[in-house]
Amino acid sequence: MTSALLGLQIVLAVLIVVVVLLQKSSSIGLGAYSGSNDSLFGAKGPASFMAKLTMFLGLLFVINTIALGYFYNKEYGKSVLDETKTNKELSPLVPATGTLNPTLNPTLNPTLNPLEQAPTNPLMPTQTPKELPKEPAKTPFVESPKQNEKNEKNDAKENGIKGVEKNKENAKTPPTTHQKPKTHATTNAHTNQKKDEK
């Protein structure tokens, strides 16, 4: 049945292609997709014989596609698992006799039971909590050099002492071991190198 429907499907597809190619174009590129010629009963009246034949063949194509899908699914819709044989004589997972190892049984071996006995009142704590410290421990505050300079300026203004402010050279932190102080010669060499690259 499916082979006959498949053959009919191929014939219908070829006929639809031939009928569509034989039709005369109604719009011929003018006003495409927006004119009245694109409607079913265009400006020239009802559709011609070829247009009706195209619609009929298209309807047959859709019906044949649905029928082909239904019969194909009915014929070949069986699962592979339906045809497999099951072995009904399976060995039992637990031996019928009581030959279990008693050391693996948690009721016979209390060391295998990790859970302790539940307390009679689970809302009551078993231990008393330790007292909390009265004051939190104070941590030392380390200021950055810039913040330290600002604080010194503010203190000097508050005390009304003039001339206490440090100049920028004294306020700078000394360079660390991984920082090299730049000299005038190194900066000039760097700018000369950029000029040479240009």
UniProtKB/Swiss-Prot annotation:
Single GO MF annotation: protein-transporting ATPase activity
The main place the protein resides is membrane
Question: Which keywords describe this protein according to UniProt?
Answer: Cell membrane, Membrane, Protein transport, Translocation, Transmembrane, Transmembrane helix, Transport
GO cellular component labels: plasma membrane
- Biased amino acid composition, Basic and acidic residues: 146-171
* Any one biological process term the GO annotation gives: intracellular protein transmembrane transport
The record's InterPro entries line, in alphabetical order, gives:
SecG
Positions with biased composition (Low complexity): 99-115
Residue ranges, compositional bias (Polar residues): 118-129
| Chain intervals for the UniProt region annotation (Disordered) | 92-198
User: Where does the protein end up?
Assistant: Cell membrane
Do you know which Pfam families this protein is assigned to? SecG
Q: Transmembrane residues, as ranges?
A: 2-22, 49-69
Membrane topology per the entry is:
Multi-pass membrane protein
Q: Which PANTHER family match?
A: PROTEIN-EXPORT MEMBRANE PROTEIN SECG
**Protein task:** Involved in protein export. Participates in an early event of protein translocation.
> What is stated as this protein's family in its record?
Belongs to the SecG family.
Its protein name is Protein-export membrane protein SecG
Give the originating organism: Helicobacter pylori (strain J99 / ATCC 700824)
